């Protein structure tokens, strides 16, 4: 059985695809997806005044997911937040948990949230972290191609194809990544 390391081009193709994604701004999938604040503009504005929420966002931006999850958890335990504000915080907490490799906690947090492309993506990342590659691949199919998260989904799909040693899926995914701009 051939492994991907014996192919002549996939490493170069993966590298070029990563460069394309980074050239798109290097933003995290959370930044690419429409925020919950689009649904609750006033709540989002009020929430931006919350120190723990600000610290959580800053920690995520600085790639400190464990610290971010702590800030978001403290923010959620606050008595003076409206339920609509807590609904804005929960996806950030779930993302931070997955990023911090607290996979089970993160998957449980996402399970409590309504279906969305962001939920599908982060659930797939969590399943990938657990080594459940086939289940992760299934979750990615729920992300529409028109959604900004689809680029991140394709990147993850390429990694999954590599782990599954599915050359055809890898080639298809890399081809779609090359066409996406």
Predicted regions and their residues:
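N-terminal leader/linker segments that initiate helical-solenoid repeat arrays
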Residues: 29-89, 95, 99-101, 108, ...
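Alpha-helical solenoid scaffolds that mediate protein-protein interactions
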Residues: 75-76, 113-114, 143, 177
């Amino acid at each position: 059985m051939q492994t991907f390391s014996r192919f002549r081009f996939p490493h170069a193709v993966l590298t070029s695809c990563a460069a394309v994604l980074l050239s798109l701004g290097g933003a995290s999938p959370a930044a690419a997806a429409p925020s919950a604040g689009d649904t609750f503009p006033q709540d989002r504005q009020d929430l931006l005044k919350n120190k723990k929420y600000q610290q959580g966002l800053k920690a995520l931006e600085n790639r400190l997911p464990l610290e971010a999850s702590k800030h978001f958890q403290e923010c959620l335990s606050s008595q003076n937040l409206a339920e609509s504000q807590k609904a804005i915080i929960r996806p950030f907490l779930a993302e931070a948990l997955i990023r911090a490799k607290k996979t089970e906690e993160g998957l449980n947090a996402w399970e409590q949230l309504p279906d969305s492309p962001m939920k599908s993506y982060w659930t797939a990342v969590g399943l990938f972290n657990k080594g459940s590659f086939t289940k992760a691949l299934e979750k990615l199919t729920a992300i529409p191609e028109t959604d900004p998260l689809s680029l991140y989904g394709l990147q993850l799909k390429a990694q999954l194809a590599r782990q599954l040693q599915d050359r055809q899926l890898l080639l298809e995914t890399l081809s779609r990544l090359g066409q996406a701009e």
